[in-house]
Amino acid sequence: MEQVTESRRKPIVVGIGELLWDMLPSGKKAGGAPINFVYHASCLGAEGYAISAVGDDELGKEIVDELDKNHIQHLIEKVPYPTGTVQVELREGIPTYTIHERVAWDHISPTSDAIDLAEKADAICFGTLAQRSRQSRETIQAISSFAPKDAYRLLDINLRQRYYDKELIE
């Protein structure tokens, strides 16, 4: 009897949004919910892609190197804004966050490569935080609209500072 094996393709998972450095008391750590999602999905066997923007600066170079080191595929634009950072302070063990504004991930553009990738996605993750700027909000909504109807859409709701409203969450 001939053995039949089924070849399964890896699911394609896309995270679009903030790529930033969390500036912790112990040092900096790469972060951003959609990119963290892609990292963990990739560790579980998915074909993961990060879509974001970084500045043409040392922090941008370092964070792209971090993605490469962790085998995270990416479509990262270099834009004329600083790479995103979040200052994290601990007060009596409780973290507080200062999320810096007018940074690279506030200026993500809907590239044709990103749209092509979204069309193949089995899951797409994005959040409210990266949609604080009009440009990134329109980009995230445009790119995610190209995902197949049956693709999972995961929304990270971030209720920090003033970067959300009822309309965005709905």
Language-model regions, residue ranges each:
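Glycine-rich phosphate/adenosyl-contacting loop at the front of the ribokinase-like
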Residues: E2-I72, V86
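Short amphipathic alpha-helices and their capping/turn segments at secondary-structure boundaries
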Residues: E2-R9, D113, T139-S145, L168
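Residue-level preference for short coil/turn positions at secondary-structure junctions
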Residues: R9-K10, E119-K120, K149
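General beta-strand structural signal in soluble alpha/beta enzymes
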Residues: G15, I76, R153-L155
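Short, flexible loop segments at the rims of nucleotide/cofactor-binding pockets, characterized by
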Residues: S26-K28, H100-H107, Q131-R132, N158-Y164
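Conserved strand-to-helix beginnings and helix N-cap segments that scaffold or border functional pockets
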Residues: G27, G60-K61, T111, S136-E138, ...
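Conserved N-terminal subdomain of the carbohydrate kinase-like
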Residues: E47-T128
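Conserved beta-alpha-beta core of the PfkB/ribokinase-like small-molecule kinase fold
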Residues: A123, G127-E170
